[in-house]
């Protein structure tokens, strides 16, 4: 009888740990928000994600504000692609054209609708995830057979 009780306790413990692990994984999956660059969004890499973070540089000369409202529009670029962003809240004080941002939101009819915007806090800082994704990518040149890394200003 003692062996049967021990077996029952072990099975219940395994069931409880399995249930807790499953619930934790499901909660994490539901709450994860991935970071994508404009070129990845336009390529369709976000098909599984309805809510994600968009990272890039605010294109100079693209910022527009509707007078008398908080509604703003601007272009975010990664040097390869451009994506229009709409935002209807107070912008961070450090928001500037030509600066890196990370916006959280979702796509609607080809425009990224931002719910939250984070601007970098000084001229030398770029969020690690954004910096990693904006590394120069090798490109093919017509007069060369080997890829050359190009950087965009």
From Swiss-Prot:
Bias type Polar residues, positions: 131-141
UniProt keyword terms in alphabetical order: Cell inner membrane, Cell membrane, Cytochrome c-type biogenesis, Heme, Iron, Membrane, Metal-binding, Signal-anchor, Transmembrane, Transmembrane helix
Single GO biological process annotation from the record: cytochrome complex assembly
Binding-site positions, heme: 121, 125
Record localization: Cell inner membrane
Bilayer topology term: Single-pass type II membrane protein
Periplasmic side: 28-153
Oxidoreductase is among the record's keywords: no
Domain of life: Bacteria
Region (Disordered): 131-153
Pfam families in UniProt: CcmE
GO cellular component: plasma membrane
TM region positions: 7-27
Gene Ontology MF terms: heme binding; metal ion binding
Cross-referenced Gene3D superfamilies: Nucleic acid-binding proteins
Cytoplasmic side: 1-6
PANTHER family found in the cross-reference section: CYTOCHROME C-TYPE BIOGENESIS PROTEIN CCME HOMOLOG, MITOCHONDRIAL
Function: Heme chaperone required for the biogenesis of c-type cytochromes. Transiently binds heme delivered by CcmC and transfers the heme to apo-cytochromes in a process facilitated by CcmF and CcmH.
Family the entry assigns: Belongs to the CcmE/CycJ family.
Name of this protein: Cytochrome c-type biogenesis protein CcmE
Organism, as annotated: Xylella fastidiosa (strain Temecula1 / ATCC 700964)
Organism phylogeny: Bacteria, Pseudomonadati, Pseudomonadota, Gammaproteobacteria, Lysobacterales
Gene name of the record: ccmE
């Amino acid at each position: 009888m003692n062996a049967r009780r021990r077996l029952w306790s072990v099975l219940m413990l395994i069931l409880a740990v399995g249930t807790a692990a499953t619930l934790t994984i499901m909660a994490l999956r539901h709450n994860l928000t991935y970071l994508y660059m404009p070129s990845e969004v336009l390529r369709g890499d976000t098909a599984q994600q309805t809510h994600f973070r968009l990272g890039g540089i605010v294109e100079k000369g693209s910022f527009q504000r509707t007078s008398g409202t908080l509604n703003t529009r601007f272009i975010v670029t990664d040097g390869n692609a451009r994506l229009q962003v709409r935002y209807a809240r107070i912008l961070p004080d450090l928001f500037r054209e030509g600066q890196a941002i990370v916006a959280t939101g979702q796509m609607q009819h080809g425009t990224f609708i931002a719910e939250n915007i984070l601007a970098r806090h000084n001229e030398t800082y770029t969020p690690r995830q954004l910096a990693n994704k904006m590394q120069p990518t090798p490109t093919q040149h017509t007069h060369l057979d080997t890829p050359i890394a190009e950087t965009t200003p």
